[in-house]
UniProtKB/Swiss-Prot annotation:
Pfam family, one: ACR_tran
Primary location class: membrane
PANTHER family in alphabetical order: MULTIDRUG RESISTANCE PROTEIN MDTC (PTHR32063:SF34), PTHR32063
Name this polypeptide is given: Multidrug resistance protein MdtC
Gene behind the chain: mdtC
Assembly and interaction partners: Part of a tripartite efflux system composed of MdtA, MdtB and MdtC. MdtC forms a heteromultimer with MdtB.
Family to which this protein belongs: Belongs to the resistance-nodulation-cell division (RND) (TC 2.A.6) family. MdtC subfamily.
UniProt entry tagged with the keyword Transport: yes
Organism: Shigella flexneri serotype 5b (strain 8401)
Length: 1021
């Protein structure tokens, strides 16, 4: 009592304490960063290596494998995957959460250095690494377009000036430039002209290489002067290469222009980028794993005016995609919902107490508790994100509960005629332990969440801590500020209510009287209620499950997968066709895409949807609509998926979820992967089934006749060099410019490589100087070859990706895949497992039951300690089954799967619904100890006296949650599962626990009496 009196009789100190809490919270709020979700990105590093012209199998065996063996020794690597395609290898390293990305980068560089001696000597550069996850959607896409500059020149501006500057911005992890390649001088050889002049391709390559040399020439000096020697040893443009003499034939000079077409072009002509049907260069910006997306985007936007000044005015620099607007809109929705929730909660208090003065008290207590929480969030390094703001919204119902219990009890004494200060002291003393029990038993609910490991633990930590801090501050405010304000603001009289509120008061009295009559009947018919309770507990609801609610971020990402033998020209046409279909959709605002590079038959598209208030469909509905139109395009597929704020793993795939097949036997993997993929494609629980295994690419297999080659004076190296010179876009020389270095690229003119007959026109100069046609010593035949070779760890791997059809959940898909694998009888040499988000879902499902049991056990222990009883905690926890059933029924009603967010709702219900039981049990025990009442009389009186605060706290929680349930703006799909579970659980538990709690209380009392052989007592009227 002295503790309460200290604050009641010292109002100035109490007010200043509350002001201090509020000011600290305001300061913390201003410094908190903004993010869509808590920081849960895995540290990911991507290693890239290239060997132009090398086949995927060559890249896998000679480049990927040595690097993997070295990189696999790094501590903290949780997953290592690689993909090798034509001339390129990419290795993705995913590290444990607690691994520092900078320390990991140093280890990666050391591993690359250690493997350098095992790599092919012909690699043009050392392997490089980037601290970014290539599977993440870019946080921003910039486009460069121009009516006067070529694509190569635009690419040069982007890669030389823009990308390095953007990479230096804090938070940027990687800037990927696509849509073309650097400028180059391209030499397109004419085979017949070379044959007529007796010039080999190696002669041309050597002549060009020797004619463009950058070497130091030294200096001259005399006694007084020094002269630097400079020569015209470099050729920089196509016009300068055109007259280059490469050979003499019968005394006549053969110039390069006589046997080739020389143009100023680009290094790789098999690249294309577009934005809204216009050729463009794309700058795809990804953030560092630990970076804040909003801060990074803001920094990039602030830099854009400066970047615009560094490029010519004829180049148009635009933002094609920015993920931050929907994030900001989502957070604004939650903030508005929080304000509405506070207003509704205060309205509930006003309706029940029907006093403006009394309503002011929780109207002050709630903001103080919530605002003060921001200070703790800042000290903990948290951010303002959807989950932390949802925690504060939910906390609105919790923090007002404490104030309501204290306020209502003090108001009851005032209505009985007690003086304000005495009523404040007496009322707070009576419910102080109750409020303490309610708060202390609520916080332990979140301990299991705090102890969770991996992604779910990281994701829920901010939510749990934020809510716990808000409850702690609320406990302090309810026992200090609330009784002080009651003692000094309220009067010792019945509240004078307005006429329009009298009807509500009469309704409340009638409701309480009706409850009292029904409760008397229930207490004399406990077996019937027991049957209802047991039936409720036994109800088992099968509900679909998923990892995280499918978000509508306003951004779609699409992967194009075409026939494996498609040409680049045809693939570029597919990109244009798909972009037109999507651009014509009324819900689409912007479309960008690119194709080419080492994967000729694939491409990527990024689609920005119109804001939510300008479209009526969700992202998934738009995907479903587009899927029908896109399926009509022959020879290629475009797989669309909505970009999510959480994406696990480093695999680049064409769908949201992955199932990986591993085998040490590559032949077995290639045999079984098509069977498994075709089976999964027939399952109704899956959509957009596709695979990264591409082993049916068209190949021309040349077989050398070595005996004939030896007889003709030709070696294998000369023959291979011929093929590389002719068809490999071989980089044969370097052009040095002040800002960058450019290449001279040689190949047979594409006009002469349109079909297989191009091989018949190739010839090799033998050791006698004679031109020997390739067909003299080689035979060729078409065959199939892999377009890519994939590894996970050191095993061959193939990843099957899939999306979920509308109405299906991840648990449905998971079970269907397991059944399909069993039905197919896949041998033990081929192992299947979920990857990425699907893998985390499996791990989370396995731990959910344990989490709920741990939360209940923790609450039981705390309640047992507080009440010094093994029995009373069971009475209080008997409210949980009905709440759980109500939550699951509500999810079924709204057709919402059980996700990680719904799990939070179940955990919260454990803390919410037991408050009603605590208020009943606490007053019943007090009445038995000090009022000499029988257990039946005590629990009956407790139920009646606590009916009003129980209704107030429950309705406050309901009204606090309703805005989130009913909100339909940005991010609503993330918030609604939490509120659906809470509202459903509260409604069900409120209907049942007002009756089941007193019945359970009496059941345990009778059990105690039976063991102590005391006579049974009956209800007294």
């Amino acid at each position: 009592m002295k503790f309460f009196a200290l604050f009641i009789y010292r109002p100035v100190a109490t007010i200043l304490l509350s002001v201090a809490i509020t000011l600290c919270g305001i300061l913390g709020f201003r410094m908190l960063p903004v993010a869509p979700l808590p920081q849960v990105d895995f540290p990911v590093i991507m290693v890239s290596a290239s060997l132009p012209g090398a086949s995927p199998e060559t890249m896998a065996s000679s480049v990927a494998t040595p690097l993997e063996r070295s990189l696999g020794r790094i501590a903290g690597v949780s997953e290592m995957t690689s993909s090798s395609s034509l001339g390129s290898t990419r290795i993705i390293l995913q590290f444990d959460f607690d691994r520092d990305i900078n320390g990991a980068a140093r280890d990666v560089q050391a591993a690359i250095n250690a493997a350098q001696s095992l790599l092919p000597s012909g690699m043009p550069s050392r392997p490089t690494y980037r601290k970014a996850n290539p599977s993440d959607a870019p946080i921003m896409i910039l486009t460069l377009t121009s009516d006067t500059y070529s694509q190569g020149e635009l690419y040069d501006f982007a890669s030389t000036q823009l990308a390095p500057t953007i990479s230096q911005i804090d938070g940027v992890g990687d800037v990927d430039v696509g849509g073309s390649s650097l400028p180059a001088v391209r030499v397109g050889l004419t085979p017949q002209a070379l044959f007529n002049q007796g010039v080999s391709l190696d002669d041309v390559r050597t002549a060009i290489s020797n004619a463009n040399v950058r070497k130091p020439q030294g200096a001259l000096e005399d006694g007084t002067h020094r002269w630097q020697i400079q020569t015209n040893d470099e050729l920089k443009t196509a016009a300068e290469y055109q007259p280059l003499i490469i050979h003499y034939n019968n005394g006549g000079a053969v110039r390069l222009g006589d046997v080739a077409t020389v143009t100023d072009s680009v290094q790789d002509v098999r690249n294309a980028g577009m934005t809204n049907a216009k050729p463009a260069i794309l700058l795809m910006i990804r953030k560092l794993p630990e970076a804040n997306i909003i801060q990074t985007v803001d920094s990039i936007r602030a830099k854009l005016p400066e970047l615009q000044e560094t490029i010519p005015a004829a180049i148009d620099l635009q933002i094609a995609q920015d993920r931050s607007p929907t994030i900001r809109a989502s957070l604004e929705e939650v903030e508005q919902t929080l304000i509405i929730s506070v207003a509704l909660v205060i309205l509930v208090v006003f309706l029940f107490l029907r006093s403006g003065r009394a309503t002011i008290i929780p109207a002050v207590a709630v903001p103080v508790s919530l605002i003060g929480t921001f200070a703790a969030m800042y000290l903990c390094g948290f951010s303002l994100n959807n989950l932390s703001l949802m925690a504060l919204t939910i906390a609105t119902g919790f923090v007002v509960d404490d104030a309501i219990v204290v306020l209502e009890n003090i108001a009851r004494h005032l209505e009985a005629g007690m003086k304000p200060l005495q009523a404040a002291l007496q009322g707070t003393r009576e419910v102080g332990f109750t409020v303490l029990s309610m708060s202390l038993s609520l916080v332990p609910v979140f301990l299991p969440l705090l102890l969770m490991g991996g992604l779910p633990g990281r994701l829920l930590r901010e939510f749990a801590v934020t809510l716990s801090v808000a409850i702690g501050i609320s406990l302090l405010v309810s026992l200090t500020l609330t009784p002080m304000m009651c003692g000094w603001m309220l009067k010792a009289s019945k509240p004078r209510e307005q006429k329009r509120l009298r009807g509500f008061g009469r309704m409340l009295v009638a409701l309480q009287q009706g409850y009292g009559k029904s409760l008397k009947w229930v207490l004399n018919h406990t077996r019937l209620v027991g049957v209802v309770l047991l039936g409720t507990i036994a109800l088992n609801i099968s509900i679909p499950k998923t990892f995280f609610p499918e978000q509508d971020t306003g951004v779609l990402m699409g992967g194009i997968q075409a026939d494996q033998s498609i040409s680049f020209q045809a693939m570029r046409g597919k990109l244009q066709d798909f972009m037109k279909i999507i651009r014509d959709d009324p819900a689409v605002d912007n479309v960008t895409g690119f194709t080419g590079g080492s994967r000729v038959n694939s491409g990527m598209m990024f689609i920005t949807l119109k804001p939510r208030d300008e479209r009526s469909e969700t992202a998934q509905q738009i995907i479903d609509r587009l899927r029908v139109k896109l399926a009509k395009e022959p020879g290629a597929n475009l797989f669309l998926m909505a970009v999510q704020d959480i994406r696990v793993g480093g695999r680049q795939s064409n769908a949201s979820y992955q199932y990986t097949l591993l085998s040490d036997d590559l032949a077995a993997l290639r045999e079984w992967e098509p069977k498994i993929r075709k089976k999964l494609a027939t399952l109704p629980e899956l959509a957009d089934v596709n695979s990264d295994q591409q082993d049916n690419g068209a190949e021309m297999n040349l077989v050398y006749d070595r005996d004939t080659m030896a007889r003709l004076g030709i070696d294998v190296q000369a023959a291979n060099s011929l093929l590389n010179n002719a068809f490999g876009q071989r980089q044969i020389s370097t052009i040095y410019q002040p800002m960058n270095q450019y290449k001279v690229v040689m190949e047979v003119d594409p006009r002469y490589t349109q079909d297989i007959s191009a091989l018949e026109k190739m010839f090799v100069i033998n050791n006698e100087g004679k031109a020997i046609p390739l067909s003299y010593f080689a035979k060729w035949q078409p065959a199939n070859a892999p377009l890519s070779v994939n590894h996970q760890g050191l095993s061959a791997a193939s990843t099957i990706s899939f999306n979920l059809p509308t109405g299906k959940s991840l648990s449905d898909a998971s079970a269907a895949i397991d059944r399909a694998m069993t039905q197919l009888g896949v041998p033990s040499t081929v192992r299947g497992s979920f990857a990425g988000t699907a893998q985390v879902f499996q791990e989370t499902m396995n731990s959910q039951v344990i989490l709920i049991i741990a939360a209940i056990a923790t609450v039981y222990i705390v309640l047992g300690i507080l009440y010094e009883s093994y029995v009373h905690p069971l009475t209080i926890l008997s409210t949980l089954p009905s709440a759980g059933v109500g939550a699951l029924l509500a999810l079924e009603l709204f057709n919402a799967p059980f996700s990680l967010i719904a799990l939070i709702g179940i955990m919260l219900l454990i803390g919410i619904v037991k408050k009603n039981a605590i208020m009943m049990v606490d007053f019943a025990l007090e009445a038995q100890r000090h009022g000499n009442l029988t257990p039946q009389e005590a629990i009956f009186q407790a139920c009646l006296l606590r009916f009003r605060p129980i209704m107030m706290t429950t309705l406050a929680a309901l009204f606090g949650a309703l805005p989130l349930v009913l909100s339909g703006g940005d991010g609503s799909e993330l918030r609604q599962p939490l509120e659906i579970t809470i509202v459903g659980g509260l409604v069900m538990s409120q209907l049942l626990t007002l009756y089941t709690t007193p019945v359970v209380y009496l059941f345990f009392d009778r059990l105690r009496l039976r063991f102590s052989r005391k006579p049974k007592q009956t209800v007294t009227e």
